[in-house]
């Protein structure tokens, strides 16, 4: 029975995480995998070539060797494993699963700060730091999404938590309170 895309990503992501952790190179492997993800998203032909069933394995290996020369031995070995087992089509999903495990271990969360106007990097960092402190996390990485309809304030969405401090939401609550009183 064939494994689903999610199952392949979970297995290989967990295997890479365990291997990197056991060999005490987790942070380095994480950094390299994030760089690799950026590169293959910018150049999707890399995955197409390495997943192409028509190309012979020697040509794929030669192509991979040219790409992987800047990576550590651990990452090179992992990429060769993906090539050997014909799993390169799942690379981005595997990296995403690896990143989830890395973030969980390091108490890192990612989320969105929705505001009426764009926030600068310092404001995003302070929001993230405040959320991290409140919820016992080491780091919260926030992406800023601009939505003028919230009028002001901020809506924070991190993992399964939503904190709606928008002016729109406060006005909605005041309106509901006035209606309830009448």
UniProtKB/Swiss-Prot annotation:
It is a peripheral membrane protein. One of its GO terms (molecular function) is proton-transporting ATP synthase activity, rotational mechanism. It holds the Pfam family OSCP. It comes from the Bacteria. Keywords: ATP synthesis, Cell membrane, CF(1), Hydrogen ion transport, Ion transport, Membrane, Transport. It is found in: Cell membrane. SUPFAM superfamilies: N-terminal domain of the delta subunit of the F1F0-ATP synthase. GO terms for cellular component: plasma membrane; proton-transporting ATP synthase complex. F-type ATPases have 2 components, F(1) - the catalytic core - and F(0) - the membrane proton channel. F(1) has five subunits: alpha(3), beta(3), gamma(1), delta(1), epsilon(1). F(0) has three main subunits: a(1), b(2) and c(10-14). The alpha and beta chains form an alternating ring which encloses part of the gamma chain. F(1) is attached to F(0) by a central stalk formed by the gamma and epsilon chains, while a peripheral stalk is formed by the delta and b chains. PANTHER family: ATP SYNTHASE DELTA CHAIN. F(1)F(0) ATP synthase produces ATP from ADP in the presence of a proton or sodium gradient. F-type ATPases consist of two structural domains, F(1) containing the extramembraneous catalytic core and F(0) containing the membrane proton channel, linked together by a central stalk and a peripheral stalk. During catalysis, ATP synthesis in the catalytic domain of F(1) is coupled via a rotary mechanism of the central stalk subunits to proton translocation. Belongs to the ATPase delta chain family. This is ATP synthase subunit delta.
């Amino acid at each position: 029975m064939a494994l689903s895309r999610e199952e392949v990503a979970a297995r290989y992501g967990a295997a890479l995480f365990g291997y990197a952790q056991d060999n005490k190179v987790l942070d380095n492997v994480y950094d390299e995998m994030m760089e690799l993800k950026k590169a293959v998203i910018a150049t999707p032909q890399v995955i197409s070539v390495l997943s192409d069933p028509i190309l012979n394995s020697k040509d794929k290996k030669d192509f991979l060797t040219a790409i992987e020369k800047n990576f550590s031995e651990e990452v090179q070995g992992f990429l060769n494993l993906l090539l050997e087992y014909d799993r390169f089509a799942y690379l981005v999903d595997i990296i995403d699963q690896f990143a989830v495990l890395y973030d969980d271990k390091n108490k890192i969360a990612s989320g969105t700060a929705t505001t009426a106007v764009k926030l600068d990097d310092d404001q995003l960092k302070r929001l993230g730091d405040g959320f991290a402190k409140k919820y016992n996390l080491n780091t919260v990485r926030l992406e800023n999404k601009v939505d003028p309809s919230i009028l002001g304030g901020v809506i924070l969405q991190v993992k399964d938590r939503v904190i709606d401090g928008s002016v729109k939401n406060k006005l909605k609550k005041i309106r509901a309170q006035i209606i309830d009183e009448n």
